[in-house]
Amino acid sequence: SNYRMGALRPNQFGVDDAHVKEYVESVAKASGEFLEIVNYNLAGQQYAIAGTIAGLKALKADSARRVAAFGGKPAFMLVPGIDVPFHSTLLRKGVPEFRDKLDALLPAYIDYRGRLVDRYIPNLVASPFEMTKEFAAKILEVVPSERIKAALDDPAVWDSYAADDQKLGRLLLTELLSWQFASPVRWIETQALLFGKREQGGLGVEEYVEVGLGNAPTLANLGAKTLRLPEFAGNDTVVYNVGRDEGRVYMTDTDSLVSDDEPEETAAPVETAPAGGSAVAKLGSSAAADAAPAAVAAPAPAAPVSAAPAGAPSGAAAPAGAPS
């Protein structure tokens, strides 16, 4: 294959999140090679780039030149073992076949309103799933879905979908998933939605749990790094990985009720009862407290709104290894 994938850290040469897409496009244009951001993982700091071998070499050289002038650390590295331009527009020709396969495999009945509405965050649009015309329009804003366009262009066609939850839900879900594999993973926006405060349009998630291997907590690490960005200052969201933090997730760990910052009370001496009598122990309050460990609240990936992350998983917010 003539394709590879690389990871780019534009903050190491002074390019921010708002300008990284423009930067990659400029290198593609100058080199005459294909380059595309396919994973937006961590604002300003981590992006996956799909491209031709020559295109990625040009990106590596240009970023190295900029790093030298800026004084940053190495900003580009190849991702080993990948020779397919995943999540790039080059895969769009495969969307119809993938859609047909999905349609054949999805259950005949899905409780779309109960299980997906306001719970599933597709990375294609980086917003909660809805059964509305406005949500369908969001899909059409990012991909040229002929099925969505046909439904939106004709009021009678849309009304036929709107009258049947199974028909409408299946249309939206198959389009979201089939187009996702040929579209970038918008994990930066998905995390901003999850961690953002409610008064600012976010979901206000209090506890975030990655379901994945404890020795490779990709999404948990991205979440923790995102929460350290200036725009999330003061956010107290707790991030877990189900393998790494099993005790917390399943409430099998124990915490002392005594704060580490507070001195423990000294237990009173145990008095020995006379022979033939019962022993009477006078214990300090700290000993009693230690005997009753505090329960740990069960984590919920989304606070009042439970969202299932993507893809980085693809298409589902959960979000996307690096999300995919």
PLM feature spans:
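Helix N-cap motif at beta-to-alpha junctions
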Residues: 12, 51-58
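Short amphipathic beta-strand starts and helix->beta connectors
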Residues: 1, 26-36
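FabD-like malonyl-/acyl-CoA
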Residues: 1-19, 204-249, 253, 257-258
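Acyltransferase
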Residues: 68-207, 216, 225-231, 259
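A generic structural motif
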Residues: 45-50
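Short beta-strand
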Residues: 36-42, 112-113
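Short amphipathic alpha-helices in soluble, non-transmembrane regions
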Residues: 19-25, 56-68
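Long, low-complexity intrinsically disordered regions
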Residues: 262-323
